[in-house]
Amino acid sequence: VAERSGPLPPHALGIGWRAEICGVIAELDGLGFCEVIAESLPGDTRRSGRVTVPEELAALRARGVAVVPHGISLSLGGAEPVAAHRVEHLAACASAVAAPLVSEHVAFVRAGGLEAGHLLPVPRTREALDVLTANIARTRTALDVPLAVENIATLFDWPDDEYTEAEFLSELVERTGVLLVLDLANVYANARNRGRDPHAELMRLPAEHVAYCHVAGGHESGGRYHDTHTDPLPAEVLALVAEFAATHPAPLMLERDGNYPPAAELLDELDAIAAAAARPPITTRARAVRA
């Protein structure tokens, strides 16, 4: 398997940093990186140009753990140009934690001044590619580190789609050189809800541009699989982890955004990702501390 260089070590294992589980995260001895929601870091970047980093997150950074700010509000796929103050906040987050890269989503979250409150899929059209290309360029102008963008989970497709998701993402990285955050749980959710083979869908994606991968849980409801980030990892997502990691070494991280389980269950999920990727566990110290 060919090794490749990237912003993060290719065999790193990480987790989404959340204040509710920061104690467990602090005990992970082999933690390669963590991702923090950029909008959760307070700061008045319009005045001071600075953000406040929580003490627990700063302690991880001081230990040498890479921290990646992950934005959710830029609306890169929105028709309006990205707001300068939002880009400045993302850049300030990167500076505050000495980030090796930052990330956002292939999505829009507002239109006509209205906030959707969640990530919405971009129509896979040439026009949308032009919009994304322009907004990515505007964003990167303010950044001193690479930008990666994430594939999102969607429950519908736009009727005027001109590309498959793999074709769309491939064209986007070809045009812009942007990196990808490959969300393996979203690959599974989108394939399952459309009656497609997730392994076949995974193999069509531009793997050589992946900066790191998300792994998360979900559940079945109303005949649909929902990528919730609040449920245990399904075996099917771990199977995608195993398949991708075997041929494309890339950093992997657990995403959990609520309904946090007991520490032992969280450690089990991290161990499951490590085992699927045939990597050493990062939970040895945490388990010893809690024994």
Model-derived segments and spans:
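Boundary/entry segment of secreted carbohydrate-active catalytic domains
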Residues: 2-27
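Active-site beta-loop-alpha junctions enriched in small/polar residues
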Residues: 16-20, 37-41, 72-75, 106-107, ...
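Catalytic domains of carbohydrate-active enzymes, especially glycoside hydrolases
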Residues: 19-43, 96-97
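Distinct, well-ordered alpha-helical segments
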Residues: 24-27, 83, 158-174, 190-204, ...
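Acidic (Asp/Glu)-rich catalytic clusters
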Residues: 24-30, 48-69, 85-100, 137-142, ...
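Conserved, mostly hydrophobic/aromatic
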Residues: 34, 102, 147, 183, ...
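Gly/Pro-rich active-site loop or hairpin
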Residues: 45-50, 119-129, 190-249
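Active-site acidic/histidine proton-transfer and metal-coordination neighborhood
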Residues: 83-180
